[in-house]
Swiss-Prot record:
Residues 23-69 form the F-box domain. Keywords: Kelch repeat, Repeat. Kelch repeats lie at residues 140-183, 185-234, 236-281. The keyword Repeat applies. The keyword Transmembrane does not apply. This is F-box/kelch-repeat protein At3g06570. Gene3D superfamilies: 1.20.1280.50, Kelch-type beta propeller.
Length: 390
């Protein structure tokens, strides 16, 4: 990671957890056995394992490893965070430090930390990223167009943390918003008939991620005049919902009749709170220093209870991001670090919250851990947190 993202810190003496001779002995094992062992190593520790030797670094990004993980039932969620300081966009993934031989003072510090941190992955330097343009399908994170007119689609393969290009959109879109159902990405946005035209048209297209092809038949948008300008989308109970910024209400696409229908829901404006995430048809978002939930089946809102240990998270939704992390909520938030009364740096914190639905109207959370995970210049802002399956 570039040194510009972190202030200088004092170096500590750390005793290596494994000797070189032990590493050499391990590498002398049969390849199939090494593959079987490494496939069981949690993804959180892969960055540490990659330091053992060059062959291990190659193994950790190989298709054979992830096939072995799938066959042995060791697939898991891997958490990512995107931040931005225009025109600079950065991507990070959650990792965990290994157990180490520590001094007494470090033992005391360890009691305050669970060892989680954010490690950099290659940046999406070819295209900007926005909250509504990033979605996850399996082990891939898709970056679709963005807010500037673009037809570009790029994919971050979270197994190897490398970017590649995907089939382009049919037109150059602005105001893009995307959601996923059954490994298909539903994309809405707006396009101009030509470069000089000031008028924009609504556009709706679906990408099949299994075949990597866009649906050849255009979807009907004649009923949605200007409804896709700066919109947000979500799938609730199998319905593709679109909430326009400048129009009241929400529209849902009826695939059987190929038309859009108005729907009533109390979650409408919450779709513009960029902290929100969805877990099992329940929407969660940060609001006024709390984590709130919305259940469309009950058409009601509530607060997640039991989070006193976490303390007050920042009030502004721009300061918080949530993600579905293995069925739990991952929460990212930042706090400014005072530096001679000049706030030049932010500390990003992360927590994992397990959820328990005790009654239809009551959801409780249990804080499993929370840690400071990254220090960044104060100009950086959150884009989105999301999890892939690897």
């Amino acid at each position: 990671m570039s040194s510009m993202l972190s202030p200088p810190v004092k170096k500590r003496k750390i005793v290596a957890p494994q000797s070189q001779s032990a590493s050499a002995s391990f590498q002398s094992l049969p390849d199939d056995l090494i593959l079987s062992i490494v496939a069981r190593v949690p993804r959180l520790y892969h960055r540490t394992v990659s330091l053992v030797c060059k062959s291990f670094r190659s193994l950790l990004v190989s298709p054979e490893l992830y096939k072995a993980r799938s066959v042995s039932g060791h697939t898991e969620s891997c958490l990512y965070l995107s931040i931005a300081c225009y025109p600079d966009y950065r991507m990070f993934t959650l990792c965990r430090k290994p157990d180490q031989t520590l001094t007494t003072s470090e033992e005391e510090e360890k009691k305050k930390s669970n060892g989680y941190y954010l490690a950099p992955v290659p940046d999406p330097d070819s295209h900007p990223v926005y909250f509504s343009s990033l979605v996850t399908v399996g082990s891939d994170i898709y970056n679709i167009a963005g807010s500037h007119a673009s037809s570009n689609v790029s994919i971050l393969d979270c197994r190897s943390n490398t970017w590649r290009e995907a089939p382009r959109l049919g037109v150059e879109l602005t105001s893009v918003s995307a959601s996923v159902l059954d490994r298909k990405i539903f994309v809405v946005g707006m396009y101009a008939d030509d470069e000089e035209s000031e008028s924009k048209n609504d556009f709706f297209e679906v990408l099949d991620t299994e075949t990597h092809t866009w649906d050849p038949q255009p979807f009907n948008c004649s009923e949605t005049k200007d409804k896709f300008l700066n919109c947000r989308t979500a799938f609730i109970d199998g319905k593709f919902l679109v909430k326009p910024w400048i129009h009241r209400g929400v529209v849902a696409y009826n695939s059987k009749e190929s038309r859009w229908e108005p729907v009533q829901t109390k979650m409408a404006m919450s779709m513009f709170n960029d902290s929100y995430c969805q877990i099992h048809n329940v929407i969660y978002l940060a609001f006024d220093g709390r984590i709130r939930w919305y259940d469309d089946a009950l058409n009601c809102w509530g607060d997640v209870q039991g989070l006193l240990e976490l303390g007050n998270i920042p009030h502004g939704p721009s300061c918080v991001r949530l993600a579905d992390y293995r069925g739990n909520i991952a929460v990212f938030w930042f706090r400014y670090l005072p530096d001679n009364d000049d706030y030049k740096w932010k500390m990003i914190w992360c927590a994992e919250i397990a959820l328990e639905r005790r009654t239809s109207w009551e959801i409780w959370g249990k804080v499993l851990w929370f840690d400071p995970v990254l220090t960044v210049p104060a100009d950086y802002e959150f884009v989105k947190a999301l999890a892939a399956t690897v």
